[in-house]
């Protein structure tokens, strides 16, 4: 189990690297593409130079989240709501895999005609499905933070993660409401959110690797210290099931 956890965590880490490398490569090969102005998804739109690259790297990214979900199952199995966080990672992964074949019709960030048709609802169903499924990735990844906080409650780590998730929720709502204010920088905005998602995945994967590498005796001592700390009324960081 520990070896499998390490392997799955490494798969999740590699997926983050593939994701960044994919949009950098596709962006470099796409004529007149601006990473600051245009969405990552526009690399896979109809008429793009190499839409298959987008399908591949976004699909690998999704598989990375599913691998991370499987890796979190054993450590959380003795915690409250043990499947909440893994299921949210699975949902994010499935959405990422589905979003690849759902190509956008055009580039709403650079084409006024495309933007107008998008607002009028005259584009194809897969264009709008792409947008909603993309939103599903963001929402499900945000919910992983709340799910972890519930599973690890009342540890200090749970409170820290919950605070961060609440801040990101507020920031997400604000940027959604003020979306049109980011005209000219929508690609940069999306990449900043993607970076936060990747950092969260990397933190989770790194913790899983470290915990799976520790000897069982060390883990038992850590859990014993956590229990003693709770008995004294001091919330401790969440431990991990040594299995």
State where each predicted segment sits.
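Hydrophobic, aromatic-enriched alpha-helical segments typical of multi-pass transmembrane helices
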Residues: 2-211
């Amino acid at each position: 189990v520990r070896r499998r956890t390490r392997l799955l965590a490494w798969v999740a880490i590699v997926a983050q690297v593939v994701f960044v490398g994919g949009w950098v490569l596709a962006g470099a090969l796409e004529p007149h593409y601006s990473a600051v102005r245009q969405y990552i998804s526009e690399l896979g739109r109809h008429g793009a130079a190499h839409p298959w690259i987008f399908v591949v790297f976004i699909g690998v990214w999704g598989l990375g989240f599913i691998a991370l979900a499987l890796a979190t199952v054993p450590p959380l199995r003795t915690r409250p709501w043990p499947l909440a966080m893994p299921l949210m990672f699975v949902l994010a992964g499935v959405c990422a895999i589905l979003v690849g074949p759902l190509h956008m019709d055009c580039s709403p960030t650079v084409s006024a005609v495309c933007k107008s048709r998008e607002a009028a609802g005259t584009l194809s169903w897969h264009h709008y499905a792409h947008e909603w499924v993309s939103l599903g990735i963001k929402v499900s990844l945000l919910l992983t933070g709340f799910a972890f906080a519930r599973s690890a409650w009342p540890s200090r780590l749970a409170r820290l993660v919950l605070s961060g998730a609440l801040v990101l929720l507020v920031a997400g709502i604000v940027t959604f409401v003020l979306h049109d204010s980011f005209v000219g920088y929508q690609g940069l905005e999306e990449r900043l959110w993607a970076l936060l998602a990747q950092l969260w995945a990397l933190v989770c994967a790194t913790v899983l690797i470290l915990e799976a590498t520790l000897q069982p005796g060390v883990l038992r001592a850590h859990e014993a210290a956590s229990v003693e700390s709770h008995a004294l009324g001091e919330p401790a960081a969440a431990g991990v099931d040594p299995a």
